[in-house]
Amino acid sequence: MDENIYKDGGSEDTILPEDENPFRNELKTSPNIKTSLSGTVAELGSNQAKTNFFASEEMASDAEGLIHSGFVFSAASYAAMAAVNETFSVVIGAKIHFFAPTKIGENVEFDARAQFNDSAKREVRVIGKTRDIKVFEGTFQVVVLEDHVFKIYKANIQKQAAQRQRSRAKAEEEAQNS
């Protein structure tokens, strides 16, 4: 086998980051997401995004090529997050409907439109189509935060722990004084 790993494969073999995710510089949300599993942003504007999700073999849930609906949901959720396009935002709820199954090799185009731009809680309507046939529709609730959700969560846990500790100390003091 004569395989030269240093041989120049040519530019047609090279996938540049801007080809994989042309909006990577404008997109504030989900910088480390695997676009091969969640789709790529095709259009990005104020309170709206369009993404393309390609259903691959690794997403199949059976031998017939049915894509597990969790992958489709994840791709729709990513489209919603892209429409909001805030660094510290997280999906807190969704109401969704699947209208048709997705199979290996299909492309689902998601169109996401966000409302309530001035609010911390945004509502995003997402429609997914395959060959102009609606296969998905959902409304996502996205909350925009001041900091990363884990930092806020940690601060809240620490605050609750301090309150419990003060309550225990107060109860012990009252017990000793009785």
Language model feature labels by segment:
Residues M1-E20, F88, K103-I104, Q115-S178:
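HotDog/MaoC-like acyl-thioester-processing domains
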Residues D19-L27, P31-K34, N107-E109:
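Short Pro/Gly-enriched beta-strand edge/turn motifs at strand-loop
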Residues T29-I67:
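Catalytic strand-loop segment that frames the active site of acyl-thioester-processing enzymes
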Residues T35-L37, N47-A49, V90-A94, E106-V108, ...:
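A generic structural signal for short beta-strands and their flanking turns/coil linkers
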Residues A42-L44, R113-N117:
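Short beta-strand micro-motifs enriched in acidic
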Residues T51, A94-F98, A112, V126, ...:
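A structural signal for short, well-ordered beta-strand segments
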Residues A63-F73, S77, M81, G93:
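Compact, glycine-rich, soluble single-domain proteins
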Residues Y78-E109, A114:
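Hydrophobic beta-strand-centered segment that forms part of the acyl-chain substrate-binding groove
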